[in-house]
Amino acid sequence: MQWWQILLIVLGSIAVLAVLTILLYKPVFKRFWDIVISFTGLLILWLPMLIIGIIIKADSKGPMLFKQKRLGKRKKQFTVLKFRSMCDHAYEKGGVATSEGDSRITKVGRFLRKTSIDEFPQLINILLGQMSIIGPRPILDWEYEEFADEKYEPRFKVRPGMFCTVDVKYRAEASRELQFQMDTDYAKHIKFSTDLKTFFGIIKTVLSGKSVYREENKNE
């Protein structure tokens, strides 16, 4: 087989995959790409993540990872994973609200939050099928109780995301109401183009250094 024939087969396969991804994104290929990206990400990042974990341990007492129960698809509870960015037992010392000057946030934690590197362990959640790369923000029980409303139910029919559409424009500046509304709108109209735009938008937002803090109910 000639090299150009191989090239045509490869390009044709890519074209077919691209078309199928666009046409069958929500029912099939969103999960397919979640698996591909999370598996590849963990394969590439396992050593840097291990080094980050060691640095976290050296910087302050406590575990490498922060674990917290969140509500996922169909309101099923799961344990979300993040690199620990606050001192151990931080919530016992000051509740869940944080601000930029919060003394509970470690030196390493400030950098992890600013760059969103603290979210990397969620690649494990994604590979396990508990989360998606892009989706509604995984919420706490009390948040659901506070904003329980039929109009927000569509957001619980899809997997929560490592990143969400709100992160692109507002990051931590959006109100809870706006967060829930945008998450619901996203869940109703999932498209490949939206996820792609959000993915690259997140990178731009992180590089811009937009605040990762808000005055009320900002969680680890």
Name every feature range the model reports, one short phrase each.
Residues 9-88, 192, 197-220:
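A hydrophobic, helix-centered structural microdomain
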Residues 26, 30, 89-107, 111, ...:
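Cytosolic-biased juxtamembrane loops and peripheral soluble domains of multi-pass membrane proteins
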Residues 1-11:
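Feature marks short, highly hydrophobic, charge-poor N-terminal signal-anchor/signal peptide-like helices
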Residues 121-220:
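Hydrophobic structural segments characteristic of membrane proteins
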Residues 65-104, 162-181:
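Short, glycine-rich, amphipathic interfacial segments at transmembrane boundaries or analogous
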